[in-house]
Amino acid sequence: MRYDFLIDTYATERLKVLSVWSEFRDDDLAVRPKHDDPRGRSVHEQMVHQCVSEDTWFRTMLGIDVGAPPLPEQETRLAFMTRYAEDSGRRLDRLRRTDEPWWEESTAFFDVRRSRAWVFTRRLTHTSHHRGQQTAMLRMLGRDLHSNYGPTADTGGLMQHHAPTIYA
């Protein structure tokens, strides 16, 4: 199918979210980029936003409802990871049953209409943007980072220097 690349991308992007979340510690949840500035989301707020916004986009724009509350009962790091892994896994299973007409069908994107493929692409970039913010938070906390799209400074530097790629 022409849109398999989007499904394949989601399959890896959901794992990248979980990988970044796994690099935080439980006591990091309240940390925000600047402790006295509420404009920068805390790690906890980023996890809430990822779970709630992805659930909302999939239900209201893509017509995929996993039938579960978007947030875990206890909002701990491990519970967020478990909830997101389960729900995103169900979404992935549903995406694998789509066909080309489904992707090309028009759907509401806030106050405009777009194809599901267009909306889904925006969802992927939205998630990637927030994952980048969280990766910056890990760097600010002085943590080593696992590879995301290839080698990082933490895994040996630049690709042209044959740095290894290390995934969590």
Report each predicted region and the residues it spans.
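Membrane-proximal, proline-rich intrinsically disordered regions
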Residues: 24-26
